[in-house]
Structures are given as C-alpha cells and as structure tokens.
Amino acid sequence: MYFDRTKINVESMKQAILERVYCGVVQTPQSASTRDIFTAVAKTVLEWMAKGWLKTQSSYYDNDVKRVYYISMEFLLGRSLKSNLLNLGLLDLVKEALFDLGYDFDQLVEMEHDAGLGNGGLGRLAACFLDSMATLEIPAYGYGLRYDYGIFDQKIENGFQVESPDEWLRYGNPWEICRGEYLYPVHFYGKVKHSIDSRGRDVAELVDSQEVLAMAYDVPVPGFNNDAVNSLRLWQAQSRHGFEFSYFNHGNYIRAIEDIALAGNITRVLYPNDSISEGQELRLKQEYFLVSATIQDILRRYTKTHLSLDKLSEKVSVQLNDTHPALGIAEMMRLLVDREELDWDVAWDATTKIFNYTNHTILPEALERWSLDLFSKVLPRHLEIIYEINARWLAKVSQKYPGDNDKRRALSIIEEGSSKFVNMANLAVVGTNKVNGVSTFHSQLIKSTLFKDFVEFFPDKFINVTNGITPRRWLALSNKKLSSLLNRTIGTEYLTNLTHLHKVIPLAEDSGFREEWRNIKIQNKEELAARIYKELGVTVNPQSIFDCHIKRIHEYKRQLMNILRVIYFYNEIRNGSGEIVPTTVIFGGKAAPGYAMAKLIIKLINNVAAVVNNDPKVNDQLKVIFWPNYRVSLAEAIIPATDLSEQISTAGMEASGTGNMKFALNGALTIGTMDGANIEMAEHIGKEHMFIFGLLEEEISELRKEYYPQGICNANPTIQEILDMIAQAKFSQEDKDLFKPIVNRLLNEGDPFFVLADLEAYINTQNRVASLFKQPEEWTKKSIYNVGGIGFFSSDRSIAEYASNIWNVSRPTS
C-alpha cells in the first residue's frame, strides 16, 4: 500500500486499518486486543510512509548528494505513533477513523513502549536532530545500537532505585525493518600479523580474532509536512557460529548457546556498569561494534555509485555525538589503509575531512579514557593505528613547539604515566575537521580549559552550535491545548520556524488571552494531578506551584540542593514561620547503576517525601513526588503542567541542557544558574522573566581554592539544622547511618558541586518564586514572554547551522 495524501480520507483510512487487523495481526475486529489494534495501526502508518521512504533514498542516489551520518550511542525516541502521524499530517484523521471503528486512540498510544535506545539529554538531542534533519530534507542517516533491554527500568523499592530489564521489545517493534542483507563482520581480540606485500607495503592482518556479526534494522524518520523519510539504522550483535548442535547433542546445553550469549551481550543493554572491569570491556566492545558496522556500511553505500575513493570526503560527513563513537576515526583508517590499500597520508586527509566531533561535557569522568592494557587486548590493530596517528601528530607538535615536553604531554592522544591511557577526546580533536560545543558558554569553556592547547594549534577548528528541540513533539504533540491556542492566535508557522513565537509577546498585555493561557495550564495540571494519584497514590493540589526537576540524577545537576531546600520549607511549615505558597515538588530521573551517591540521593528524596507527605501539620502546603522510570512519554505529560523548571546545575558543568528549553516552550518559568543554555535563554527571553541565582563559573573557580563548606554552616544555623536532621536520622530511622555519606560529601569531602555555597541564594530565590506566584497576572505575563522568547532554541535552527557550518550539505534538488 502506498500513501497518497490527496486520496486519503476517514473511510479509506478505516479500510486500511481493518486490512491490517485481518491480514497483519490476523484477528477480527471483535477478537483483536488493544495491542493488536495498536500494531495494526502502526503497520498501516509504516506502509503509508513506504513510498516517501523509498523515494527519499532514491533521490539521494539520483542526485549523488553528500550524505550526513550521525553516530550516537543513544537515540531517546520516546513513542513514535503520534509523532509519525503528526509529521504525516494524519493525526486527526486517524483519531476520527479509530473513533468510528470503536477504538480509543489514547488507549492505543499507551500500548507503545518508549524505545529503549537512550537515557538522557544526549539521546534526546539525537532524536530531535533526526526529526529536524528529515524536516529540513537533509540527506542524513542516524546510526546506533538496537539494545535488547535499553538502559533499565527503574523501580523504587523502600525508597531505593532498583534496576530491572527494560522489556521494550517484548512485543516487537512495529516500526523497524530487518535488513538481513546488511550483515557485517566485526572483529575483537586476536593478534596483528605484519608482512610486506609485492609493492613493499607493510600489510597488517588481524588473526585469531573473535568475529561477531552486525545485523541492520531500519527505523523510518519522517519529516514534518513533507514527503521526506530518512533512516535510523540500528545494529544488533549476532554470533557467527550460532547454535552449536554438537554440544547440545552431548548434553552441554550451556556451551551450545554460549557464543550466541557472548555475542548478544554487546547489544544487550545501554551503558553496562563500568565500575567493574568486565563492564569496561563490554563498553569498549559496544563502541567499536557500533563504529565498525557503521563505517563498513558507509563505504558500501559510497562504493555503490563511485568506482574510486577519490571523492569520499566530498560525499560523506560523519558527526560523532560525544566521544563514544570516536573509535570511528581509527576504524576508518583501518579500512582505508588495510582493506582499501590507500597510502596513509591520503587516508588521513580523507578521514580528517569526513569526521566532526560534538563535545557534550567537561566532566572528567565523562571524558573517555581507555587503559592501554584493555585497549591492546580488545583492539590490538586499532591501538597500532592510534600509536601511528599520535606519532605523526606529535611530530607536528614538536615542530611548532620544539623542546616543549609539557605541550607534547597535553596534546598527546596517549596519556603517559604509571598507567597509560588512550584519551578519546584528544583523538576526536586530532582526527576531525570541526569540533563544536553545544552552547555559547560551553564552547567558550572548552576552548579556554579542556582544549586550550588544541585551540592554539587549530584556531579555526572549534565552533559553537547551540542545542535545540523539536517543536513538533515538545509543543504540538505534548501540549495540544497550548498549541491550539497559538495556532488560533498567531498561526502555525512556528512549527517550522520557531522564531514566529515572538508574535505571542504583544498578547501578554491582553487580559482575556492571559486568562485562556492560565486556564490551559490549570487544565494540564489537573490532568497530571489525576495521573499522580492514579499511578503513585499521592493527592496533590493543582492550584499549587508545580515545581519540576526531571533529568538524569547526577551530583552536578544538584537534585541534592533541591531536596535540602524542601527540608528547609518543611521546617518553615512545621515551625509556623510565615505563609507558605502551596508547592508540589516533582523529581524524576535515573541514576547510573554504579553511581552510589546518585542512588543515595534518590533514597533521600523518597525518604523526605515519605515524611513530608504524611505529616498532618504540612497538609497540602508541600508535597514531594519522585516519579519512577522517567522517560520521554512521561516528560510529555509533566512538562506542559509545570510552573517552575529546575535548571540548577553547578555553573560551568552543564554543557547546554535541553529540558530547560522544553519547559520554557510550554510556559514554565525557569529557576536556574548561569550555566549551559540558561545563559542564552536569559538573553533571548529576558533575565527579568527568569529566576537566576548562584555563583558564576569564574566565582566557583576562585572559591574552589579556599572553599570551606563547614564555614557556611557555622554562619547559617538554618543550613546547619538541615544537615543535622539528615545526620541525626530524621529521614532514616531504619538506618541511622544511611545518609552519612551525603553529609560527609558536603562537609568533609569539600562539597565538590558547591551545593552549600549556593543553597541560601537558592532558598531566597524560591521565596521570590512564591511571591510572584501569588500574582497570577504577572506570572502569566512572564509565562507568555518565555514562550515568545524561546524561538531561537529550535533543533531546526541547530541542524541548519550544522549543515551550513560543519557538514556543507543541502537538500536534494528533487
């Protein structure tokens, strides 16, 4: 079935869905379950996309376009049914058709599991970028891994995070197409055998290696309101040998499937626990598996229409989303030199023109460094290649800085010392054409700190592309009421040019418009409150401030500071110290399985919630929610109902953030530090329409030299009281020592994320929030200004900048 937009109507849509019920899931409308109907609808939509998908890919070949390959360990897609229908322009028609057939569309949507392909902002950014690349008709492909169990399902048991498998593929993925014809070998371990060929070239061959196969699965990515459909290709690891029948026949059932299990482990879960050596090894194998299969596929596609590799760098641009795929640089060199027999200099020239690197962090633990022992064991040939890259690179460094060993050390890809490491960020800089940060502040920071020495060598390599979000999912899809109001008052152009939102700013002075705006927020809050009660059993007041802190749990994101503030307000209520504006504080986010402190912070939040929510003196003045298993589909419910967006990272540690943009797009006001994209948001929205507080990055750098957290407690009895309550087991009577690591972190381990340094300013700013919330007309004006000023932060704008300033690509001519 090919989708013809001009011929589709409710009746033809009903017929198409029923055909899939009968022929696709082999049920009758009477016997089909809700899941069957969801699958039938999804398969119908997939068939509607097929013609555009094929036409798009054909146009790339016909026009011999330069293609973009976006490689990422994460793609946090969320659910696809509503998003695909919205982009195809069929959402309302499908809803009507299903209603006529007697089905509830919202129930069908709930049948779809969020795709288990990501965890945090890195993956969600990649997903927004895929949407924008298709909408802008950029010839692009996403490449990632098809994880069997995602990162994990988060459950809360007795306040603790408990990880369980994310069974997102239990019922299959109706959006994927298995491409069995694209099966690539990927090799690990072994040893390198060198010989001289007839032309006198050194030939490297990996022998005695372990071979794993990469199987391709394609997921369509439709653009908004056009016929373009790009591809996200995901790799699944499979054993070369498969089921060992001889072992099975002799009763050795475990050995019979051992190879299948070991190979499959590579794509079993996202980010295996790297606090153990086995987890580190598996992570390295994951990253190499991704880039090896991807680059083999890129070369296959290129050589399909080109007889030589002369134009490879003119037709291919690869974007590395963080350092995880940086091994692709060494893999491209291996394939070009070892397999294609190019001279080293020719191969290196092509490679450094093809690859580009997006840096997402300056946090030391997130900048990948692989021990030489592990690297040489898993990827011996690639270590040789990296040594050669480094030797040639350091020769250039020595030419520019003769005798400067400190400069050589700083710029080396290999870190010397008692233990040696491969520095993947340095490899990513040396082996790429452009390096970009993801906010103006972050880009300045990496140039002045992390890559300062590289900037001296490559002054033109480093640029900025501020992150963005897709307004299709984060407004039109998730906040139908607000988008309908905007459509009616300022038109729909903002969906493809978000700067048109500025047209709403004059309406902030219209009292009738403000009332409509306010009523939409209240309705969204009432719906969320009902869901909180249904799923979590907690009654919250929709008239309270909905104060939301939903993101990955990490010390630098300072969920700890937020819960300390909650304890402060709890004490204020208990002591009767003045009027408190009713507040509902909502937390959500996952902690990495091996990150003990982050998991303990989750426990503290839940224990504080248990005390606060059950204290009759508090009543409805303060409620604390930790919503388990935070994910895209949950964010789509929380963000439209939020009044206050928590963006309170330690200044200098958040590269950009995109949650801040999503909240502002939905009319929430931001409380935040001058960090990441908050700084640019303040410029575009107006600092007066946000609640900015806290130390600046340069102030933190100075304070770090002589920071004494205990002195803050000595000077502020209120803060000391909060820590005493934690230390004295007010929130942990089952285990009086439970939260001592948190108190120690703050007082005895230097408070590395400056929680106590910013806490008083944070509390004072929260008091300003409460004062403004008591003035609904003024609050609503600022809410409108937030939406009107957020237009710069579209992923369409981000992708247009990548296309122009990094990739040098444009849409096909036909």
Swiss-Prot record:
EC number, UniProt record: 2.4.1.1
GO molecular function: glycogen phosphorylase activity; pyridoxal phosphate binding
Magnesium among keywords: no
Pfam families assigned: Phosphorylase
Database matches in InterPro entries: Glycg_phsphrylas, Glyco_trans_35, Pyridoxal_P_attach_site
Entry-linked CDD domains: GT35_Glycogen_Phosphorylase (cd04300)
Disulfide bonds: none
N6-(pyridoxal phosphate)lysine PTM sites in chain numbering: 662
Recorded GO CC terms: cytoplasm
Gene3D superfamilies given in the database record: Glycogen Phosphorylase B
Keywords: Allosteric enzyme, Carbohydrate metabolism, Glycogen metabolism, Glycosyltransferase, Pyridoxal phosphate, Transferase
PANTHER family: GLYCOGEN PHOSPHORYLASE, GLYCOGEN PHOSPHORYLASE, LIVER FORM
Family that this chain belongs to: Belongs to the glycogen phosphorylase family.
NCBIfam families found in the cross-reference section: P_ylase
Protein name stated in the entry: Glycogen phosphorylase
Species this chain originates from: Chlamydia trachomatis serovar D (strain ATCC VR-885 / DSM 19411 / UW-3/Cx)
Upper classification of the organism: Bacteria, Pseudomonadati, Chlamydiota, Chlamydiia, Chlamydiales
